[in-house]
């Protein structure tokens, strides 16, 4: 079997209000979804935990989808033929903030989001693809939709989850079970504390 990747563009528009970045020229923003069809038995996927326990299509492939955004020169021939991939921690797009000294935005589109144009003046394509399956929608976060791994009887795979709490201030006496409103917390399998 062969893995398949399909990028479905749902939005295409000028980036940075059509501003030209030196010899590279203007940029455009492509937004959409990437559809992955993965062979769970392939050597490259061997270390993906429980991938072999996800539902498969008739050809034996496992499917998932991720948000994707690309900033690229309108004329690719004027670019440097290099791609900068920002994995986007917790669904956020940070590369322009850190490399272009731009204001942070999960919806980069304006001249302010281009900042000093560091990537653009050098001709890079900048790409974000969601990679965390526990993010909730909101604030333009990148989302990844993954299948649920299941036991042979069809029930979801469950197990012990351990959490480490770090005290970061003197006098702290309690912690929320999930400190991130952007992350999906899975419900407890059982509320029986004797287990």
Annotate the PLM regions.
Residues 2-195:
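C-terminal His-loop and adjacent cap/lid subdomain of alpha/beta-hydrolase
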């Amino acid at each position: 079997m062969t893995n398949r990747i399909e990028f479905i563009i749902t939005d295409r528009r000028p980036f940075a209000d059509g501003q030209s970045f030196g010899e590279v020229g203007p940029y455009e923003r492509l937004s959409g979804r990437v559809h992955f069809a993965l062979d769970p038995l392939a050597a490259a996927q061997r270390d993906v935990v429980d991938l072999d326990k996800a539902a498969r299509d008739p050809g034996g492939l496992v499917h998932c989808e991720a948000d994707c955004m690309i900033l690229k020169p309108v004329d690719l021939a004027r670019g440097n033929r290099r791609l900068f991939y920002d994995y986007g921690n917790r669904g956020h797009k940070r590369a322009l903030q850190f490399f272009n000294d731009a204001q942070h935005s999960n919806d980069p589109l304006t001249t302010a989001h281009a900042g000093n144009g560091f990537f653009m003046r050098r001709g890079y394509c900048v790409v974000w693809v969601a990679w965390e399956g526990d993010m909730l929608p909101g604030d333009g976060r990148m989302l990844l939709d993954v299948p649920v791994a299941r036991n042979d009887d069809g029930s979801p795979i469950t197990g012990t989850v351990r959490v480490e709490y770090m005290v970061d201030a003197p006098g702290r006496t309690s912690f929320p079970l999930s400190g991130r409103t952007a992350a999906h917390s899975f419900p407890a399998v059982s509320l029986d504390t004797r287990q």
